[in-house]
């Protein structure tokens, strides 16, 4: 009888652990930031017109891959690898974008995206 109780107890603990893990993923942390630009901006290989966009990581296991979607339609407009970079000390934790330089007639390139409040960001790779 004690062996049966021990096995039953072990199975109950295992089921509880699976339940806690599954609910943790359902209520997990999201990396998404919705950003609005009043002028066109550029990412490697694409120019985004003025508008609202969702910046996110591809998955919790691929933090170096960033996906940018149209905020309304959800259509993927950009997906690419990034380098992890530290937020500059002088940059506010509420500033999500660092821009690169462009001429007057070009869209400003987004150099890096920093999740709001995060100390690390995603540097876009231009070639």
What are these regions (language model features)?
Residues 1-6:
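N-terminal secretory signal peptides that target proteins for export/translocation
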Residues 51-56:
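A short tyrosine-centered beta-strand micro-motif
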């Amino acid at each position: 009888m004690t062996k049966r109780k021990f096995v039953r107890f072990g199975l109950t603990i295992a089921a509880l652990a699976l339940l806690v893990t599954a609910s943790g993923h359902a209520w997990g942390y999201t990396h998404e930031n919705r950003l609005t630009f009043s002028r066109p901006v550029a990412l490697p290989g694409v120019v985004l017109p003025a508008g609202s966009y969702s910046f996110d990581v591809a998955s919790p296991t691929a933090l170096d891959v960033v996906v940018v979607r149209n905020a309304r339609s959800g259509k993927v407009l950009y997906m690419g690898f990034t380098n992890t970079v530290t937020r500059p000390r002088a940059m506010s934790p509420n500033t999500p974008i660092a821009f690169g330089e462009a001429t007057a007639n070009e869209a400003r390139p987004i150099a890096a995206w920093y999740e709001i409040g995060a100390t690390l960001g995603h540097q876009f790779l231009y070639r």
